[in-house]
Amino acid sequence: MAEITAALVKELREKTDAPMMECKKALTEAEGDLARAEEILRVKLGNKASKAAARVTAEGLIGLYIAADGKQGAVIEVNCETDFVAKNTDFIDFINKLAELVATQNPGDVAALSALPFGEGTVETTRTALVGKIGENISVRRFERIQTPNSLASYVHGGKIGVLVEFSGAEEVGKDLAMHIAATKPKALNADGVNAEDIAAERSVAEQKAAESGKPAEIVAKMVEGSVQKFLKEVTLLSQPFVKNDKQTIEQMLKEKGASITKFVLFVVGEGIEKKTADFASEVAAAAAGRA
């Protein structure tokens, strides 16, 4: 069994917001397996322990562009190493120009985007020059483009959350949808779009919690299904309560406005990226080695 160190307990607490003693107990039960300990906490403490999915550490910015005719748009994520660089005007300008380039040139992937003409060189040579000027690594992580006969709306929150929405209806509806998505971070439009692995994971947790109730099997089955359906309502856009009027779901709001939504793209900076960290002693040793 792996040693249950204070650092391991601290890491689990930061991932889950669970009490320190509960983290230690979970790690002991999981024999030091961090992922298993997190699952144990979810069963014991409920969905508060799922905050790990939303905790990200990579820095960078989201860029958005919508053409003047409102028929094509793009969202892009570009990462850097520190928040300080994310506020650099050259970095911001680079991202905004990349978003426009994606919308107008429709590259197939990051490699194709990197090869496109940009200024006096290419996107890649410009990126390399910017790395040299700023002194930090910069990477184009992902982008998505939408071309539509309908309408597009976008919203960026603090440069860290970006939303692009394809919809039909009044301009105000598009703005409301984009802001709502940024606030609630749905996984999909409806249940059909939710990743099967996410549903399976939620069902597994629900089954373990329901089994601990000691109730008859038929009741346990209903409890599990109820938990899964509740999860799906929480993470699917059309089922969510509208943030500006929680007495309506998004689906009801759209029907009332005579509007519809076809697609949305949601990017959160650093989502799914784990930033490598070193303990203080290691940092001092590395610095000393660098001076030697």
Curated annotation (Swiss-Prot):
Keywords: Cytoplasm, Elongation factor, Protein biosynthesis. It comes from the Bacteria. GO terms for molecular function: translation elongation factor activity. Pfam families: EF_TS. Its main location: cytoplasm. Residues 82-85 are annotated as: Involved in Mg(2+) ion dislocation from EF-Tu. It is found in: Cytoplasm. Transmembrane segments: none annotated. GO terms for cellular component: cytoplasm. InterPro entries: EF-Ts_dimer_sf (IPR036402), Transl_elong_EFTs/EF1B (IPR001816), Transl_elong_EFTs/EF1B_dimer (IPR014039), Transl_elong_Ts_CS (IPR018101), UBA-like_sf (IPR009060). PANTHER family: ELONGATION FACTOR TS, ELONGATION FACTOR TS, MITOCHONDRIAL. Associates with the EF-Tu.GDP complex and induces the exchange of GDP to GTP. It remains bound to the aminoacyl-tRNA.EF-Tu.GTP complex up to the GTP hydrolysis stage on the ribosome. Belongs to the EF-Ts family. This is Elongation factor Ts. It comes from Bordetella parapertussis (strain 12822 / ATCC BAA-587 / NCTC 13253). The lineage of its organism: Bacteria, Pseudomonadati, Pseudomonadota, Betaproteobacteria, Burkholderiales.
